[in-house]
Amino acid sequence: MRRLSNKGEHQRNLNDRQRKVLYCIVKEYIENKKPVSSQRVLEVSNINFSSATIRNDMKKLEYLGYIYQPHTSAGRVPTDKGLRFYYEEMVKLSKETEELNLEVDTFRSIPLADPEKVLLLAGNLLARLAEGYVLIERPNPRDLKILRVMLIPVSEDYLIFSILTEFGISKITPIRIHEDLNWEEIERQLNFLLRGRTVEDVLTGKVETLRGSGILKLIESVMNEKLERYIDVGFENLLKDDTLSLEDIKHLLEEIKDHRFLESLIGNDKDVTVKIGKEIGSKKLERFAVFSGRYYKGSSPIGSVHLFTSKITRYDRNHRVFNYVLNRLSEYFTSAARR
């Protein structure tokens, strides 16, 4: 906590010119991936001061930990602290400009009964526009409301047991039957008991009539089928990034196997969380930046989204694209739940 306070104090110690110099250095380095000299700052900005003044500003920025000099006579390179400054300044600027004009109609063309397609579409859109690796968490079927239960006899010995939940997500399994019962009446009674209840309510015994019954055990077996928790898209973008090594990418793949690591990246509020380099908390991931956030059904979070890129990335673009995708997913699942 102390370090955060010092960082804010350091930023207050920068005058407007020094903030412009720092912003220019980071932006130029992100675009060209080459150390930035004082002369280059003057060439690409509207700062009307001498090269000597800019060099003095750069010395102060280096002293405060925003930039560093990789070797003598080289230009300057932003540190994680410098990248964080750039991201926060960019967010302030983006609030004063128009929102990014993205493929707004794309989500409207997907049927409301096909959430898997929507998640894949969102992942592909984010990975392509942000040039990063995307993980999208699927909604947990146990948290969804049951819309309908169906028992469909298909032969003398088998029937199909189907549970349809919100967003068109269904679980289907064939079951062997040993006696001829009135399956239509059983289906009607099950729908009376289960419709509008969450799967979690049923499995935790909140529907008293079903406690200890064969139907409850059947629902448990259907809902506990293995489902990959995350959709992943855009891995090839990391391989194409010349600021990342294969070793860096290998370390990332090892870390994301642990779902607790992914959960640790998200803040406690609705805001997007951005962690840059050392802020991620793993020495092996210091070359990365990660954008993390949740998407919602109404006011309830139902899944998370993570975007991994090199920390030398287009923060302005990625911030807007990431927020756009989160907002569209929340709109989609909120609308689907109201049908």
UniProtKB/Swiss-Prot annotation:
PANTHER family: HEAT-INDUCIBLE TRANSCRIPTION REPRESSOR HRCA
One Pfam family cited in the UniProt record for this chain: HrcA
Signal peptide limits: none
Name used for this protein in its record: Heat-inducible transcription repressor HrcA
Any one GO molecular-function label of the UniProt entry: DNA binding
Parts of the chain that traverse the membrane: none
Keywords tagged on the record: Repressor, Stress response, Transcription, Transcription regulation
GO biological process terms on file: negative regulation of DNA-templated transcription
Cited function: Negative regulator of class I heat shock genes (grpE-dnaK-dnaJ and groELS operons). Prevents heat-shock induction of these operons.
Recorded family membership: Belongs to the HrcA family.
Source domain of life: Bacteria
Database matches in InterPro entries: GAF-like_dom_sf (IPR029016), HrcA (IPR002571), HrcA_C (IPR021153), WH-like_DNA-bd_sf (IPR036388), WH_DNA-bd_sf (IPR036390), WHTH_HrcA_DNA-bd (IPR005104), WHTH_transcript_rep_HrcA_IDD (IPR023120)
Primary gene name: hrcA
Source organism of the structure: Thermotoga neapolitana (strain ATCC 49049 / DSM 4359 / NBRC 107923 / NS-E)
